[in-house]
């Protein structure tokens, strides 16, 4: 199946989720994520703020701040994405494509070992990922390739196999619920 068709099908499944289903899966993923060695060992989390029916990440990012970890979330500048440090997850506003992002343009996060949480539409057991089509994470990780990466998704987003392209960068770990 081509990426356009796959993206459309997954978006339709996400739109069909009830708020209760999103909350239940997000709570399970939060607990699972906070129990991982990746989380426990990370000093810095490059997270993301949820958009539409994405996994709700705010509780995990708030816990990371409470646990003394540094947290940054992405902000888009044209076709590039940079992570901006955030101490307060309320200091955000709709940005690129109405996705929540920091109001401030700085300070720009600069931890090459930060754990990067990645959204996406579809994943497979080999870590292949189909994103939303902007290429923001692929470009970021091509420029900063040493980050450990972890994707969060719903069970229907986990597929047996995805066709990928040369520029697609796989994730190290995928958690789903």
Language model regions located:
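N-terminal active-site beta-alpha-beta segment that forms phosphate/nucleotide-binding
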Residues: 1-111
